[in-house]
Amino acid sequence: MFQRRLLHTIKYAKQPQLYLHESITFTKVSFSKDPNKIHIGEVPSSSDLSKVNIEPSKFMENSKFKDILHKTIAKNIYDDQSYVIEAINYRGSFMPIGDEKVIQEYMNQRPELPNTMGFVHVDNDGIMEKGTYEVNDTYTLCNVDGIIKLPETMLEHLLKAL
């Protein structure tokens, strides 16, 4: 006779946009409540899912997720009102597109490079130029500042893409 282990899903207490999906060998970290959707990455399993702590040293990124993330940003960034407004401050340069692991203390403060998902070119009138999103290869989903957190509008687009 064999034992059957019930697998379950909970919200991650330290980042409420995320869900933890229990598995036999690892815990999937996801923006989706559905454990079958593409996950952000994974951490080793724990006997108590509520005690899982996502740390950079234990977190394994899912490259498929990163591809979807960047495609979603590249497609939707130009119509996201929060970025449209912010672009005015980056006339004639590249605007960093940061996640929200760290909330910036003042206007025009650039996110640290590991928290910058990519860059968009802004013209001299303060308008993002479509098709100019460039991926930041040094971006990490999970680092000493925490795990990825997205603006709500971008999260909605991402959930549709997953």
At which residue positions do the language-model features occur?
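N-terminal interaction modules that seed assembly of large macromolecular complexes
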Residues: 20-73
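Mature, matrix/stroma-exposed regions of nuclear-encoded mitochondrial and chloroplast proteins
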Residues: 58-162
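N-terminal mitochondrial targeting presequence
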Residues: 1-32
